[in-house]
């Protein structure tokens, strides 16, 4: 569990440092969560990773998304566009209900 959590936190920080907007989209997090993830120290990352609970979630929770990601592969560019479009609807929580 620790390895998976630490890998997620490390990847999250790298994505957010590289391109914050793209990282937020790929991680499916809000600006507040992105800022908190980017600001974590190594000790804080270790503490979170050691919590004994998975701190990330797989987003393809709808059959259509999972099916689109696993079907016979059409041209690579089309796969990337379709995947981005399918995940875009799941990327950020509905902020109107917050």
UniProtKB/Swiss-Prot annotation:
One Pfam family named in its UniProt record: FlhD
As one GO molecular function, the record gives: DNA binding
Give an example GO cellular component term for this record: cytoplasm
Q: Where in the cell is it found?
A: Cytoplasm
Q: Name one GO biological process term.
A: bacterial-type flagellum assembly
Q: Which Gene3D superfamilies match?
A: Flagellar transcriptional activator FlhD
InterPro entries documented for this protein: Flagellar_FlhD, FlhD_sf
From the record, what ranges are coiled-coil? none
Keywords tagged on the record = Activator, Bacterial flagellum biogenesis, Cytoplasm, Disulfide bond, DNA-binding, Transcription, Transcription regulation
Q: Does the keyword Disulfide bond apply?
A: yes
Q: What is known of its domains?
A: The C-terminal region contains a putative helix-turn-helix (HTH) motif, suggesting that this region may bind DNA.
Description of how the protein assembles with itself and partners: Homodimer; disulfide-linked. Forms a heterohexamer composed of two FlhC and four FlhD subunits. Each FlhC binds a FlhD dimer, forming a heterotrimer, and a hexamer assembles by dimerization of two heterotrimers.
Q: What does this protein do?
A: Functions in complex with FlhC as a master transcriptional regulator that regulates transcription of several flagellar and non-flagellar operons by binding to their promoter region. Activates expression of class 2 flagellar genes, including fliA, which is a flagellum-specific sigma factor that turns on the class 3 genes. Also regulates genes whose products function in a variety of physiological pathways.
Similarity comment: Belongs to the FlhD family.
Q: What is this protein called?
A: Flagellar transcriptional regulator FlhD
- Organism equals Burkholderia lata (strain ATCC 17760 / DSM 23089 / LMG 22485 / NCIMB 9086 / R18194 / 383)
Name the gene that codes for it.
flhD
